[in-house]
Amino acid sequence: KEIFENPRTLKVAEISNDPPMNILQANIDSNKIKFEGIDVDVPNHLNNVKDKNFNLGIRASNIELSDNGFEFEVELAEISGSETLLHLKRGNSKIITSIEEVMNFNINDKVKINFDIDKVYAFNENGILASSPFGGSYV
């Protein structure tokens, strides 16, 4: 449970999740997390992150399709049992989301997603956990 909730490193975060945790290069500026033209409010658990530039971790299960979300492009859609794994990209960032139903998508389709900002992780530039939603930090 501790490894899942508070993975010490990026590598542990990637291998202890299936699909692997999404890792995005981000920065904090003016109390906003910014990446690939997306600005979201910094959640309380990331207020003490010291590095302006960091790696943002988002689990596939914490990303959902949303009419009011951020636009991404479909790179691949995999049907796995009763779920669909969507491989998405925006600029230089790539993510995977897990949808708990079988859905059909075409390569290059545009979809909108949102994610639960209160469940994101921050890893410093050395890949060490700086903050988790469960209070973990190794820096």
Where are the regions that the model predicts?
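Short acidic-hydrophobic catalytic motif
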Residues: 1-5, 13
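ATP/adenylate-binding site constellation spanning eukaryotic-like Ser/Thr protein kinases
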Residues: 6-9, 17-18
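Non-catalytic connector elements of ABC transporters
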Residues: 19-23, 28-139
